[in-house]
């Protein structure tokens, strides 16, 4: 099961938190769709800003968005112009609710699966050999101190007539262990031969239960 399912979804509520945090009764579907549209808009508008995660929290008439990015300067823009434009557009999507955007800097892009996958995809678009792109990314990520990494590319690799998948890994990536902190990210490379899918799994080590959590469980 661990090999097939999205590692983040499998661990939500165990060691990972939800990316959308709010409660609704009647208009649950509308708010869920709103979240989806907001994320899609941010992903398209901030394509080159290395956005790794978008967290959304809602209160009565307010939407708080946390943007995790490796390039905060690009998200904020000159004098805050970019982030203000982003806020205005999201306000329209959110039916006039008050929108607050918080930019969180990602210190090390090589230790975030989504950004590693995007980096490999950009290299593939620049006609770099897929083996070279994967091996270089693996080396850079392992230098950050992670316990293991697994990468996979699928599609017409090197312009081949028949699509295939290739995997490279280093260290350990225990997908079945629920307490294992595994970061998972995907990206797509648009090449002249078609799309190439990129998947990356990073293993950061085990999340051990704290004393407080253990006491709560005992109660």
Curated annotation (Swiss-Prot):
GO molecular function, one term: rRNA binding
One Pfam family recorded for the sequence: Ribosomal_S3_C
Record-annotated KH type-2 domain positions: 38-107
GO biological process per UniProt: translation
Domain of life of the native organism: Bacteria
Cellular compartments per GO CC: cytosolic small ribosomal subunit
This protein's UniProt keywords: Ribonucleoprotein, Ribosomal protein, RNA-binding, rRNA-binding
Family: Belongs to the universal ribosomal protein uS3 family.
NCBIfam families: rpsC_bact (TIGR01009)
Functional description taken from the UniProt entry: Binds the lower part of the 30S subunit head. Binds mRNA in the 70S ribosome, positioning it for translation.
Subunit and interaction comment: Part of the 30S ribosomal subunit. Forms a tight complex with proteins S10 and S14.
This protein's name: Small ribosomal subunit protein uS3
Lineage: Bacteria, Bacillati, Bacillota, Bacilli, Bacillales
């Amino acid at each position: 099961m661990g090999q097939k399912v999205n590692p983040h979804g499998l661990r939500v509520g165990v060691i990972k938190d939800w990316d959308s945090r709010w409660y609704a009764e009647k208009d649950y579907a509308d708010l869920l769709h709103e979240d989806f549209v907001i994320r899609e808009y941010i992903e398209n508008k901030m394509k080159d800003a290395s956005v790794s995660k978008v967290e959304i929290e809602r209160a009565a008439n307010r939407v708080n968005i946390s943007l995790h990015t490796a390039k905060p300067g690009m998200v904020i823009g000159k004098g805050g112009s970019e982030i203000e434009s982003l806020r205005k557009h999201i306000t329209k999507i959110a039916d006039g609710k008050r929108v607050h955007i918080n930019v969180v800097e990602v210190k090390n892009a090589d230790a975030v699966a989504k950004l590693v996958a995007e980096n490999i995809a950009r290299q593939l678009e620049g006609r770099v050999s897929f083996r070279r792109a994967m091996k270089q990314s693996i080396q850079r990520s392992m230098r950050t101190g992670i316990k293991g990494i697994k990468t996979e590319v699928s599609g017409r690799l090197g312009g081949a007539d028949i699509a295939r998948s290739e995997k490279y890994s280093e260290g350990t990536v225990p997908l079945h262990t629920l307490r294992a902190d595994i970061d998972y990210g995907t990206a797509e490379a648009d090449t002249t031969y078609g799309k190439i899918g990129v998947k990356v799994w990073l293993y950061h080590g085990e999340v051990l239960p704290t004393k407080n959590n253990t006491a709560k469980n005992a109660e």
